[in-house]
């Protein structure tokens, strides 16, 4: 494969992986299914493309040596590509698990390496970018056949990997047990730590852009809201999933109680740690603010005294330790 065609193939694969990975995180599960397939196929295509890239890079290093910042940026990109792709494949075939001795699982590290790779690739393209030949040069019959062969091989290899992979959801997450109360993995978003919350002084603040004045509710006040229960799957981006019986009150009931439901089109839920997310009206109407799981009060690691349960959305959007809700 010509050098520039190999580079463009790698760039296309990495771009596809980043776009499909990020969008699949943000979209509801019902809309993300095709993106998971695209992500797996692009990942296999990336690994296959590395064979051609290795030949190109070896010739280039023999000719130019390792001097120059562009070469080192390229080597950094190669290293991150190997780490991200290696962790992804290891996860698929079950060589690594979501159980980990430190804060992030192998799947988390796969994501971190992929995001770091994006920045390195941009720098590499800017430093080594070439304007000639134009892309139309690669539209010939030979290039098209090579591209189709790579795509076909990627689909075949992906199907083969899926046959030997451990049981998992479309997202790649593995089962971590269900209906176990608080006995399921504890995952902390980003660099958050589990806060020490004194429930006696904790307050849930509800405010918005309506005429209603802000409201603060104590933990004991939550018992006056209509009680809701639901069995919902929590699919964590750390690579595991669990189905639990959550109980609490609906976000819609809370807003109605505080006089802020009619005009709200977006609802922002904020943790005492600062982690926050804004949900549209349809998502907010499905959400539950849970105080219990499996009949047990939430443990500190699982969000006590209050956490969001957001059906069909990934776990990093299930805000823990909720301290404020803003309707807009």
Describe these PLM feature segments:
Residues 1-184, 193, 206:
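Membrane-embedded alpha-helical bundles that constitute the cytochrome b-like, heme-associated redox core
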Residues 160-328:
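Structured, non-membrane catalytic/scaffold regions adjacent to prosthetic-group chemistry
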């Amino acid at each position: 494969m010509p050098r520039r065609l190999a580079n463009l193939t790698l760039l296309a694969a990495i771009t596809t992986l980043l776009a499909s990975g990020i969008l699949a995180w943000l979209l509801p599960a019902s809309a993300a299914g095709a993106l998971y397939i695209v992500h797996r196929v692009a990942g296999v295509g990336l690994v296959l493309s590395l064979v051609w890239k290795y030949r190109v890079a070896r010739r280039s290093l023999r000719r130019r040596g390792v001097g120059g910042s562009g070469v080192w940026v390229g080597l950094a990109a190669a290293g991150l590509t190997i780490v991200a792709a290696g962790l992804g494949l290891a996860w698929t075939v079950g060589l690594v698990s979501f159980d980990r001795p430190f804060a992030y699982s192998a799947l988390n590290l796969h994501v971190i390496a992929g995001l770091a790779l994006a920045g390195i690739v941009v720098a590499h393209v800017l430093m080594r970018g070439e304007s000639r030949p134009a892309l139309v040069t690669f539209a010939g019959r030979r290039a098209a056949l090579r591209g189709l062969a790579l795509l076909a091989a990627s689909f075949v290899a992906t199907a083969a990997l899926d046959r030997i992979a451990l049981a998992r959801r479309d997202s790649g997450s593995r089962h971590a047990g269900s209906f176990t109360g608080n006995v399921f993995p504890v995952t902390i978003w980003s660099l958050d730590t589990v806060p020490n919350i004194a429930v006696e002084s904790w307050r849930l603040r509800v405010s918005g852009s309506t005429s209603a004045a802000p409201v603060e509710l104590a933990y004991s006040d939550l018992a006056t809201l209509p009680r809701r229960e639901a069995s919902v799957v929590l699919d964590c981006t750390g690579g595991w999933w669990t189905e639990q019986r959550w109980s609490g009150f609906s976000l819609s009931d809370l807003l109605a109680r505080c006089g802020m439901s009619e005009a709200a089109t977006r609802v922002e839920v904020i943790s005492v740690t600062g982690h926050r997310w804004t949900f549209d009206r349809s998502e907010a109407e499905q959400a539950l603010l849970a105080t219990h799981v499996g009949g047990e009060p939430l443990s500190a690691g699982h969000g006590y005294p209050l956490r969001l349960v957001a059906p069909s959305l990934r776990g990093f959007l299930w805000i823990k330790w909720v301290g404020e809700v803003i309707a807009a």
